[in-house]
Amino acid sequence: MKTIDLNDWTIFSSRPGSDNYYNEDQTMMLKVFKLVDESILPNLEREMAVSKLVSGLGIRTPEVGDIYQTPDGHYCITYEAIKNKKSLSRAISEDFSLAEPYMELMANAAKLIHGTKCTSDIVPDYKDLFVKGLGEEPRVSEKKRADIIKKLEAFPDEGCCLHGDFHPGNFIISDGTVYAIDLVGFTKGHYMYDVGMFYFLACVLPGKAQESIFHMNHKQAGQMWKLFVKYYFEGSEPDLKDLCDYAFMNMMTHREMVLIPVMINLSLMGFPPFPRKAF
């Protein structure tokens, strides 16, 4: 594998799982993963393949380059650098008057993604990911696992493209153009899988978590969600139970969530597994 020297790059942002760098003339971005473990290589290779696939579908995303490794063992991916860009959540947190126009832009980008059918074998079905996550979750009994899978089978299959980590922090804007980023979780299935995740992050998580994700408080995140609903659903309101069910499935593929046992019990009893409602 090709190596890369970080002395030739300048860090410009840090996220929980990676640090981001620019080259000298800021034409390329380097995403350096914090975990030093070759087990992440398949995910990196998949992220590269998915980025190329997504571009071919007409969904705007920075052009992907190649995989490298630093001398101390960190894996990296190069991307086209989008100049003068900000994530939608960062821009809104700095000027909340941008919330409405930017949520309209995000809703339009989401409609393009969700309106695109995905038949590629490199993109997994969200139900398969859910079942895998459920099987690896030690806090779920065999009986509950069987009950949840039975419930899962009743969910519709649509086969549309899904971002997989859908929230305003994973959409950037530059000169009025919106790009989708961080596509390692890209999958296919029902659009509510994505929408439910945004609901969970904006309206369910406590304020401290939202400050970390969105750079804003719980109330502002809820207002942002409501504006997204306005433009994505065009006047109608999503069903709260549906949002919760799909968010539950998404969170099961991100199994570090400590709320999973409570979510499982409430979901099986037929109740929305989250205590808070959308603003």
Annotate each predicted stretch with a short phrase.
Residues K2, G115-G164, P168-G169, S174:
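An alpha-helical support segment within catalytic cores of ATP-dependent transferases
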Residues K2-E24:
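ATP-binding glycine-rich phosphate-binding loop
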Residues G17-L44:
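ATP-binding glycine-rich loop module of kinase domains
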Residues P42-V54:
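The N-lobe alphaC helix and its flanking beta3-alphaC-beta4 segment of protein kinase-like domains
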Residues E63-Y75:
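Short beta-strand micro-motifs within the conserved protein kinase catalytic domain, predominantly
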Residues I77-K85:
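Short pocket-lining segment of the protein kinase catalytic domain that shapes the ATP-binding cleft
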Residues K85-P124, R145, L152:
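Conserved kinase catalytic-core helix
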Residues V195-G235, M249-L266:
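Active-site activation/catalytic loop segments of kinase-like enzymes and analogous catalytic loops
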